[in-house]
């Protein structure tokens, strides 16, 4: 694959780097009170646009196909929204004794509170040949669940900014997240055939709006002379993120393949990806609302910005290995179930 083709394929990750660089060069453009007026365009319009887009693109009619696999869904959601944040909280009690930047550590906690993404876990499950219907259900259901659970987890583990009261956070979440999502689902009912025929680039649209949110977030950071990020902390956080992903992928793999769980090899693939992936699309707008007024908001966002490309990179690298395991396991199970030929 040529360099240009690779850049075109990974345009979003390239975009993140470019918008952060642009914010560094001239932070006043996207900062508070700047020409872009992020306090209106981002806080209300951009966030609402992302969730309206999610409402349009979520195929809720497909969820019924996987609805009955209760044990699998229960495991994924409990692992993602209960075990993951709790385990990271315990881990951070140890890391807080190190010289790593405390706001990056808080950022790791925010990563753990995020719901599964709508796309990446499904794409990787499909690439391996795993239980795609289960992956679709858990990604979509986790996104809906995350609208309520994620802000509660963030407030539980980190608290909100002192300038924004609890009721204000949830009223804003309702107006900019829940309402646009519901409107998107209602509109989808009426134009479903057109959407299926034309297949609008929902992912690309959300990603472009997300780049705008990331840009203004970092404009605020670089406008603040009090914020200092050391290279040591950043490098260590990258290593920690890859370690967490690998450790949790291994943990979910070992559990789902143990005896008496009843999961098929295809189920295991969906479990491994859906349980360990975290949503950037839902995460950044939520952080923007819950931590409004935090001068360190962008530092808190950094681990999530790293986690997103890391999970795609790691997942893509492991696709051939996981696929090979799944096919050999399915073959072995098929052989053991075949009736023995009498002598």
Swiss-Prot record:
It is found in: Cell membrane; Endoplasmic reticulum membrane; Golgi apparatus membrane. The chain crosses the membrane at residues 11-31, 38-58, 72-92, 117-137, 139-159, 164-184, 202-222, 235-255, 271-291, 299-319. It comes from the Eukaryota. Keywords: Cell membrane, Endoplasmic reticulum, Golgi apparatus, Ion transport, Membrane, Sodium, Sodium transport, Symport, Transmembrane, Transmembrane helix, Transport. One of its GO terms (molecular function) is symporter activity. Residues 1-10, 59-71, 138, 185-201, 256-270, 320-343 are cytoplasmic. Pfam families: SBF_like. Involved in teeth and skeletal development. Has an essential role in the biosynthesis and trafficking of glycosaminoglycans and glycoproteins to produce a proper functioning extracellular matrix. Required for extracellular matrix mineralization. Also involved in the regulation of cellular calcium homeostasis. Does not show transport activity towards bile acids or steroid sulfates. This is Sodium/bile acid cotransporter 7. It comes from Xenopus tropicalis (Western clawed frog). The gene is slc10a7.
């Amino acid at each position: 694959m040529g360099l240009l083709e690779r850049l075109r394929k990974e345009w979003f990750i390239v975009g993140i780097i470019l918008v952060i660089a642009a914010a560094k060069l001239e932070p006043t453009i996207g900062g508070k009170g700047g020409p872009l007026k992020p306090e209106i365009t981002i806080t209300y319009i951009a966030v609402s646009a992302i969730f309206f887009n999610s409402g349009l693109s979520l195929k809720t009619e497909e969820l019924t196909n996987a609805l009955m696999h209760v044990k699998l869904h229960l495991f994924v959601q409990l692992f993602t929204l209960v075990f993951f944040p709790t385990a990271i909280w315990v881990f951070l009690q140890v890391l807080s004794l190190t010289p790593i930047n405390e706001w990056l550590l808080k950022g790791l906690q925010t990563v753990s509170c995020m719901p599964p993404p709508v796309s990446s876990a499904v794409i990787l499950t499909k690439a391996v040949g795993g239980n795609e219907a289960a992956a679709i259900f858990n990604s979509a259901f986790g996104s809906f669940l995350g609208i309520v659970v994620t802000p509660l987890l963030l407030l539980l583990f980190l608290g909100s900014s002192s300038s924004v009261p609890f009721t204000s956070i949830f009223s804003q979440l309702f107006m900019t997240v829940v309402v646009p999502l519901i409107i998107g689902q209602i509109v989808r009912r009426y134009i479903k055939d057109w959407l299926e025929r034309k297949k609008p680039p929902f992912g690309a649209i959300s990603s472009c709006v997300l780049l705008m949110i990331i840009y203004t977030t970092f404009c605020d950071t670089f406008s603040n002379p009090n914020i200092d990020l050391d290279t040591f902390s950043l490098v260590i956080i990258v290593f920690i993120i890859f370690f967490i992903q690998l450790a949790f992928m291994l943990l979910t793999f070992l559990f789902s393949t143990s005896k008496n769980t009843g999961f098929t090899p295809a189920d295991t693939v969906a479990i491994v990806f859906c349980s360990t992936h975290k949503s950037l699309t839902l995460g950044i707008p939520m952080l923007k609302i819950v931590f409004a007024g935090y001068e360190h908001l962008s530092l808190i966002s950094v681990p999530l910005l790293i986690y997103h490309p890391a999970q795609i990179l790691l997942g893509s690298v492991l696709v051939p290995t996981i696929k090979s395991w799944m096919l050999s396991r399915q073959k072995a199970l098929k052989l053991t179930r075949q009736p023995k030929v009498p002598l």
